[in-house]
């Protein structure tokens, strides 16, 4: 009994520390918080989650660069994406071609469907949410897809850690001071 109480107390302390608006400014969740329309929020969150590994200071710097390239309009950026706009943008394993590969797949998704929410909701309805999402990206990746692409879109079939995709999903479905809670299918 006391072990459970200690754990609950420790969790309560963490909630008080991190479940606050002040937490947003130093976290990748700051990027989807900058937008009002649902599709821009989900795209900003997805893009931020792709790059959220390594040094927090470094990936936030790179995300700021990327959102500058997107002129702070993620939906317009993706719907009209052309690889040349990336120039030499990269982050760790992710090279310009890797980002272009992902953004071209997102372009197809947003120009032919309702976007990420529809894709995740379909996967959820099939009880294979992450597998469906990953399969969508992998089935559309060209033969040019390299290590960086697979680093950003890990494969749960091969034991790939889905930590960043879970973080993105949490931002989209959970309501709170930090999480946006714009998806209701779960």
Task: List each language-model region with its residue ranges.
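HhH-family (HhH-GPD) DNA N-glycosylase catalytic core used in base-excision repair
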Residues: 3-186
């Amino acid at each position: 009994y006391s072990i459970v109480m200690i754990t609950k107390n420790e969790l309560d302390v963490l909630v008080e520390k991190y479940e606050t608006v002040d937490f947003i400014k130093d976290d990748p969740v700051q990027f989807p918080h900058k937008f009002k329309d649902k599709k821009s929020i989900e795209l900003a969150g997805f893009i931020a989650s792709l790059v959220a590994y390594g040094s927090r200071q470094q990936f936030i710097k790179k995300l700021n660069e990327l959102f500058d390239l997107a002129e702070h309009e993620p939906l317009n950026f993706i719907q009209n994406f052309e690889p040349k706009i990336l120039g030499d943008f990269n982050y760790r394993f992710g090279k310009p071609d890797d980002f272009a590969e992902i953004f071209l797949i997102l372009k197809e998704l947003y120009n032919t469907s309702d976007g990420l929410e529809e894709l995740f909701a379909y996967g959820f309805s099939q009880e294979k949410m992450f597998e469906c999402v990953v399969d969508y990206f992998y089935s559309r990746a060209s033969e040019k897809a390299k290590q960086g692409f697979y680093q950003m879109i890990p494969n749960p079939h091969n034991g790939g850690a889905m930590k960043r995709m879970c973080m993105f999903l949490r931002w989209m479905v959970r309501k709170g001071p930090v999480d946006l809670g714009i998806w209701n299918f779960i």
